[in-house]
């Protein structure tokens, strides 16, 4: 008892641990505790259509697992340890281990006595079973041992096999127990599994198997449902009654859980008062009995079982219980969001081949996505999907909407696509009767995040139920009543049960039918009598046919019942339709006439005893059967001969084709006869005749071959016939043997038939062949019209969607399948016969042949790029042509830009003509590229964009189907090819490595759908070797020159240079192409020099080409120079495919001991003597030039020394004495205004010439020639020397501007004097350069400049006024105040002591009669104007001239005002300036008339009289000498007189006077001096008493001719090109201090630079930083402006040009002043003197004056003699200013006439109008001009 208790406790303990392990196993089932089978990968788990559910059962507990269990994974299950307990330690450990782990195969070991347990049966075979029908069997287990065996567990790893637990878990010795196993198949096919029994003695493997066929109740396969949480789905339960009796449903139940059953009504039949017959299913009918609702309440993966109980009603009283029907529904409830299908499968059921199924809708819903989804891509995954046809349920993209807000259920259902199965597209082999089709349809959302798939299945069968013979054919003459049994043949692949038969309504009154048995079962392939047909009433004559319906368990079949006449129709394919007339034939000739016997009845017709009249002459052949309207059913190469009389059956509605052949006997005997066609109802007789003649009709060529063609292509051949008969014949018919409509004849007119002339060759025209003429199904294997459904898919693919591979593959296979079927049937070879009939010879046969092929737009099946070196680009040109007669739409796409290229390669690989390599390029865009797309740069005239746009326009605008939605990508080549149009394609290949690569060029088109072209390319290596050495090798190509090569160096003739040949060594080098690709050497050079350099020379220096492993001899010669022992160079070879050169080093060696000797032996160059003598001549010439230059330099040095000898000694320089005599005027005699000055006539001025040598009159001729030659050389050198001075001066100026000089600190006043003096010198020098063509004025160093400036300033101060009343200072602008503060700060830093300037008193202005008084407008601050600044047009009235002070070089204009206060006079460095009042706009345009103007208007003809000042001078001006500094002549006189110079008549001829003249032209004081004034000044400077002129004097110094016109000029405001036409600058009225001069000049220079040359701003600022003087800055700027006269002409107005259109003031200088006139004694001029009137001194520095005589004179003396050769002229003094012209055309001189002020006015200012009006006409002209401007 104790041992038993111990065993029991061990057993329960083991069970306890076993249950715990099962719970753990089931808990972690979702975590893949059970690994998958080897043949199923984890990635394919979601694609498994069946949800497999395994289970482990222990006792009555059943645990389902998510994945199948493999046997090797269950060994760790706990096993009862009962044996160990029995042994109690006596058993060895090995025995316990073996008992626990040993495995027994029951099937192999059964019956051999080796099993501890025997199982009966050893293997369970369930046999044949159907889906949904369960079979239950028992397995018996017997204990073969004498000990107990514990049965632990049963493990089954299949969901289709179930097992119960053992009836007894403890098996006593020799005891027996059992368990039940159930087979419930879910899918069709064989199923098997292994069951594992875990026991205490080991594991037993037991095999179970079964076969599953289709379910008789037509239950669809259970593929399982997937649905989200909190959702439900409904599945209708439809049951088919496969029995011949009624089946009643008695019970429906489910296994519970998430499945519920909904009956058709809410309550049961009793409460609804429905009869029980509602649940009856009639025989062979289907009925929905309930609805299965699946609810996703909990997340699980389980299986729902539905049991349906039924019974069979054999009669109303007899019932037979039926087996239960089990529906197994796997269900998986998921928590994840996504898209779910509403159906588990699209089941099409049984589809007959050739028919189209009903549409199945693929619908989806979304769950917890939150936004709407768009689907536009659907495709069929794998498998044979040619029979699946899909149509979008709505216009794509199809939107799947989310559920309403706040809802947790599924969203609304959205229909994606309608799916059809087309049975006519299913291909079967002749032996195959049924084909199972299945697969998956996948819908892809935009972005690819949410995809959904649904499986589909269908069974397509072939066959029908057909009546036998004429059982259902009623002859018209048959009279009722008549009864017959109808036999049916079952040609279906399965058995058929016919349970009912019905008639069409129109047959009910005439016929009656009844089945022979309750259910007629017809086995597959058998014939059985089915029903009895009774003919009760005669049919009307109009009756043709009707239908009888057979109701079977498969479907309803239709049988046709018809009437027939039994008559036949014999059609002869000949001209004569009533007899077989062969016409003229030749002996031993063979002719054939084809005829067709048509059976137009719906019943089979039999011809009886069909035979020919004479076997010796005639033969009868059966060709085939032809359908009505079909010409392609007959093959001419297969014929059956009828040897004897035979009965021939002709099928209904068809015709049988026969050939009657005539073989003319050799003896020429004519054997005519008859052919009889006889049936049961009628007979016909046709005669057979022929005539024997000599001759024949022969076609040229004998056989017409059309070659390869295809639909949409038209081909033609010319038909010619030679007539060898003796007489002419007329062609009566030209046709084909089968009357094929694809052949037609051009040029044959039956109304005007051609005549075949005897013995001639006649052209009968062209025979045309168009394969697509009838366009039947078999032959129209090409073309996708854009308006068709398939064409819409092609058009959709133009936008390159993601499912493009599926679209193209589908379209291609649809077309290709038709062609393959045509090839398989042999119909692609067309062999027909053309029949030629004439009036005499008939049925002449001409054979024709053609072959239908698959066309190609690209003539090449593959493209092989040549070997291409790495880094190079190869382009191949291809021709793409449209070979058809219709337009073809194309789209060319490289594989690298094709979407999902890998899928396309897999789909198209079986259809490729050439195989792809292992390396298919799909990523690198440039490796295989299409160069003619808009992805690359195209030429401006490229038609590619226009062709693409035309294609888009055709689709979007001319085809409303696409609704303007097609947008073709630009990186594809898309267009419409017109018929026979050709285009050129450029394909590029750029290798990246040396591997052979391949790719595809895809030509999408609506002719063949897609045309793939394989491209091959491989990178090649480039290699060049020269003499076996690689490029850049360290081993050079050596020229080794030895002693034996240099033996000729000892040749005496060579040492004497009598031999002109040189030593040259030549060596050939072998250049070998060691690479894989040919190359061309385009250029060769040595160290960068073509062909020859450094002594090396390539003899055959021209391009050459080398193939791989080919060599070329390159000859290189070396000519040593014997300077070094070694010489090195680089040989450079340039190739067409490589930009860089291949470099090979060259080297040469020469023995060192031979260098000197061989170098001495080298030949001299032939030009050595010529060069020698040329050099000697050049040296002599240079020596002569040097001597001439020395002479010129000495001459200049003497002239400079003479000038320095007469230099002015240094004196104290006082600025206060400059304007003492400025306030008085000196009366000057005047001349009549009508006198015309002769000096105004332009006279040539002799240029300055160098001193020359003179020969004596008695000198020899040779001496005179040498002296003349020397003078000529001096003149030439002088000309060059003169221009070199300019160049050297400019270089010096540039150096001076660039170098920063350190100058010592000087007194600012002295610096200002030096600056003013330097400006005067520069101005004089500029005038000399303009006159003397570039001669320079004398230059001074700083010391000399300071001394001369002191003396000049003292003389200037001596005539200045001692006391001056300053005007009040006008208010200053912000910029002026800022400038003044800067100047004061600079002055405070530089001045040692303040300098007080005495104020200057101004006299009231005197208005000129000739010019109205105007008020000036104060301008803005002196800011430079930009180029884009608007120019102001304001009239500027004249202002009085102000005396000049040395504080500034350019003081502003002033007008007299009241004296300022003494407090204001103490301001240092301030120059008083009068600021005129601002005029009103009306006054600016129309100035008021003054009294002088009114007087002038009253006396227009009178000459102008001098104008007296408005107020008399004060007492301060009485003691002042009469000479006024406002007159240039008087100032020169005073200046020279104060210098102590002699004033006698001959003093101007002295060298001192000539040397002093360059310093006299002081432009700062308004104008040049007259000759008398200059004479007085020179006398004063020489120590002679000056001649003073007072009011009573008789000797009057008159000014030059400019004095007359300076103030009376009529051009002061009229001409735009004159200075008078210029408006006063904006800075004319601003206060200018002494220290502001530099800033004023800087502003002027900066403005000019900004206007004319922006690039000079930086240089100018740098120069200003170096504190250049204003004269230097302005001179530099003037030189730059002189070098760009075009800029001056275009921008004449710069500073102060804002008022250019106003009438200018009277500040214009007189243009008639002759500046080259020599100031001498009055005897040199003839002059008239008039009364002298004083002139006011208030003149502006700008030349503006309010008096008509600013120089103190109102008359001018005109010179009467020419002064050009005068020794005192400025020309003889070395001063040649601007050339003097006449008063009408002479240059006008102003203070702005120098280069310093070219920035302000154009050079055209100095060229006034050609005609100078008279003085009497000036006022009127001036008024006219003023009026014009005012208007």
From Swiss-Prot:
It is found in: Membrane; Endoplasmic reticulum membrane. Residues 30-1169 are lumenal. The keyword Endoplasmic reticulum applies. The chain crosses the membrane at residues 1170-1190. Coiled coil: none annotated. Pfam families: Ig_TMEM131_2 (PF24495), Ig_TMEM131L_4 (PF24499), Ig_TMEM131L_5 (PF24501), TMEM131_like_N (PF12371). Residues 1455-1467 have a biased composition (Basic and acidic residues). GO terms for cellular component: endoplasmic reticulum membrane; membrane. Residues 1223-1252, 1325-1516, 1663-1759, 1800-1831 are annotated as: Disordered. Keywords: Endoplasmic reticulum, Membrane, Signal, Transmembrane, Transmembrane helix. InterPro entries: Ig_TMEM131_2, Ig_TMEM131L_4, Ig_TMEM131L_5, TMEM131-like, TMEM131-like_N. GO terms for biological process: collagen biosynthetic process. Residues 1223-1234, 1394-1407, 1435-1448, 1500-1514, 1808-1820 have a biased composition (Low complexity). Residues 1191-1831 are cytoplasmic. Residues 1480-1497, 1669-1687, 1702-1733, 1742-1758 have a biased composition (Polar residues). May interact (via PapD-L domain) with collagen proteins (via C-terminus); the interaction is direct and is involved in assembly and secretion of collagen. This is Transmembrane protein 131 homolog. It comes from Caenorhabditis elegans.
